[in-house]
UniProtKB/Swiss-Prot annotation:
PANTHER family: 6-PHOSPHOGLUCONOLACTONASE, 6-PHOSPHOGLUCONOLACTONASE-RELATED. GO terms for cellular component: cytosol. One of its GO terms (molecular function) is 6-phosphogluconolactonase activity. This is Uncharacterized protein SAOUHSC_02143. It comes from Staphylococcus aureus (strain NCTC 8325 / PS 47). It holds the Pfam family Lactonase.
Amino acid sequence: MTNGYIGSYTKKNGKGIYRFELNENQSRIDLLETGFELEASTYLVRNNEVLYGINKEGEQCGVASLKIDDNGELHLLNKCLSSKAGTGCYVSISEDKRYLFEAVYGAGIIRMYELNTHTGEIIRLIQELAHDFPTGTHERQDHPHAHYINQTPDGKYVAVTDLGADRIVTYKFDDNGFEFYKESLFKDSDGTRHIEFHDNGKFAYVVHELSNTVSVAEYNDGKFEELERHLTIPENFDGDTKLAAVRLSHDQQFLYVSNRGHDSIAIFKVLDNGQHLELVTITESGGQFPRDFNIASSDDLLVCAHEQGDSVVTVFERNKETGKITLCDNTRVASEGVCVIF
């Protein structure tokens, strides 16, 4: 049995963090329950037996740390709610486990926290930095919108996507906070959202929410150079849709991207050691608004959460040879589910 967690909005029926048990032998979820009620826990990241989730209480915003016990159940360690500038949308941990990074979409800011490397508790907010970059012309690009922050494969920087400014910004970081390093621009109105790095550290898959495209970019010392781009929806689709999550299979052979509105998952074959993509197919996600999904470590199953509609959690069997996915379970619900991790 594999334990997984789903983060959620708590605007309507969402409860916070859901815990589920994935039965990989039967290709289904045997149990899905409220793991811990945590307001606005829209993104999660795990460090072994510690789980971090975005959180807010009233006007105070930040991150909570929770201990994962031997049964996969969650117990609160502590909270660091040191800001009133807005709730985050993405969190990640530095390789040395000393820092936690947070991106805040609404306010266009990034945060950096100090962690206790022994207990996993959050010690303090080190810095909150506002983006001030020229924005695109799309109606949703009225100001900067930091959407993702994570350490680069070389370990030297953090890369931050800005959906409002159509770019990736890299920063040096230390105990004092962030220091601007470089920026990489994409097309106007792309709405740069997330990054998935190939294991070789040379190539990155940059997804753009507003243009519904994925860029293959060469990464070198804090800079991203676009090599090619691909639509993640059919060319003739004219409905309202926006790209969401991106994940590589663990064997690095296939890339998956979800589309909210078209309600699908696009599957690409990874070629030439990561520098090219080729569309395999686009498969229905089995629900409404597939905000996030993840792939079990075995590479056999893909689990997808849906923010809207019935908020069904779909499980797909994955063909490792073709990359294609087949729906095999849609019996569980995680209201307002927007993040899936194992």
